[in-house]
C-alpha cells in the first residue's frame, strides 16, 4: 500500500492507451489542479494552444506553481513524479481560470487536461488555503446556488465547446461539489458527453439544489469517494447515498488531504464504512443545518466565519499554526452567541484544529474549559 505519490512510481510506466483513466488518476489530476498555473497555462478566453508538461518545466515562473504552502513539498513531488512517468509526462493543459473575490466570498478555479489517449479531464480546484475559500464550503448550505457553482456550469459549457470527444469531470473538496453541480445543470448536449463525474471528498447538496438540477440523469455516473473519517465530504450528504469509503493513513480532518489516501495497485484501499463517532457528528451537523431556514443559515455561517476570522488569520495554515493565539481570539468571539450555535461551531473549530495535531487539539479542549470557567467566574 502507498499513496498517490507511490502510485506514480509503480503505475507510471503504463500509458493511458494501455490502461485507461481510473479513480486514482482522477485524484492525481484533481490535486494537480491545485497548482498555481496563473500566467503559465492559457486562460479560458485566450484561444491559445494547450501547453505541455515540458513547457511548465522550462517556464521562468515554474516555482510559482508551488505557492500553496500547505502542499509545497508534496505538490513538488507530485509534479516531479508526473513529469518522470510515461503516464503523465505527455499531459497537456488549457483553459485555466482562477478567480478570488473576498467581498463576494467566492473562490473559483478550473483547468482542462488533455491525456495521451485522446481523452479529456475537466478539473475544478477545491478549497484553497484561504479562509474565504473555506467559508464557501459552508455557503453551500444555502438553498440558492453559490457564485462558484454558477461559474462551474459556464466553464464546463465553454470548455466542452472546444473539443468534440467524451470527457471526464471531477474535483477534490469543493471542486467535487462544483463538478457534480456543473454536470447536472449544464446543457443536455454537453451532459450526454460526460463519461464519469468524480467527487473526491466533496460536499453534497441541499435537497432543493438536487431537485432543481437534473441529478437523476447523471447519478449513475457520479463516483463519490470519501475517507473513513470524512467531515467535508459528508457535509449535506446522506448516509443512505452511494459513496465509496477509503482508508487513510491519517486521522480526523487531516484525512481530507489527498496525499493521505491509501492506494493498492490502481485503486484506493476500501474501508467498510465511516467511523461511528464521525458518522454521528456528520448526521448531527447535517440535521441541524437542514432544520434551519435561510435567515438562520446566514446567521450560522456568518457567526462561524466571524469566530474563525477573529484570529486575524488569512489562511487555515495561519489559523492552526499559532493555535494558542487563535484559540484565545476564537473564545472571545463566542460572546453573544446562543448556546446551540456556539456548541455546533465549537465542534467545527475543534475539527479544524485537528490540523494542528492531536497534542494541540487536547490543549485546545483544556484551554476552552479554562476560558469558559474564567468567563463564568467573571459573571
Where on the chain are the PLM-derived regions?
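Alpha/beta hydrolase fold serine-hydrolase catalytic domain that processes acyl esters and thioesters
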Residues: 1-24, 29-111, 115-120, 124-141, ...
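Gly/Ala-rich beta-loop-alpha elbow adjacent to hydrolase catalytic centers
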Residues: 170-175, 179
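Short glycine-enriched nucleophile-adjacent loop
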Residues: 179-188
